Amino acid sequence: EKSVDAGKLESYYHSLNDYFERVKSKPFILNDEEKQPAAMDIGIGTFWKDSRIKFKDEPEKDRHDAIVESRVVSTQPTIPEEIAMHGFFIGRIAYAQHEDESLMDIEDVNRNRYSAMHNGLDTKLYGTNGELGEATEILEREIQKAEQGLEYAEIEDPGYMDLLYDRLDSGTPADLMAEGFNNGREEGMDRKEALKRGLDYQVK
């Protein structure tokens, strides 16, 4: 698991000082004192973690903003799935805030991350209470919480969450693409034709 650490957090950020120390721990390409503000921007820009904090300073507009950038949501195959996945995260965060949930153990988060990356839905995941269960069962509960969170946030879902429920039954996009490719090969297609079939995956 330690070999797959791109984006992974070893622990939650405890404060802005903690965050800055982590950014500073990586090599900087600008060390000139006059260029330190630019060095910080570049340092944060090359701090490849799933969550990072950026700062927007526009004195002429009296704007001094801290922006939390989440890089957790991976790009989806289609726009409807993209909307569904972002809707899930918005709803899930709203649920956690409304219910005042505690943060999961970071080790469980990283184990889930590793398991999902390597095994997709064919694995076991840790739930928010530390219980270990089948990925599809854990994720079904998470989608339900996201739906509740969207209600808390007064955001109407016209059916995007159904795409995520369907995915629990049909498999991930990667599963479907692999199935299309393998079926094509079994039917005698060459690799290029089979690959095209695999890439023809679309939301129905």
Positions of PLM-derived features:
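Intrinsic-disorder-associated interaction segments
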Residues: K2-Y12, P37, D41, L132, ...
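Intrinsically disordered, low-complexity N-terminal regions enriched in serine/proline/glycine
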Residues: S11-Y12, D18, P27, L125, ...
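Generic alpha-helical secondary structure signal
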Residues: L16-N17, V23, D32, E99, ...
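Substrate-recognition/cap regions that form aromatic- and gly/pro-loop-enriched pockets
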Residues: V72-Y165
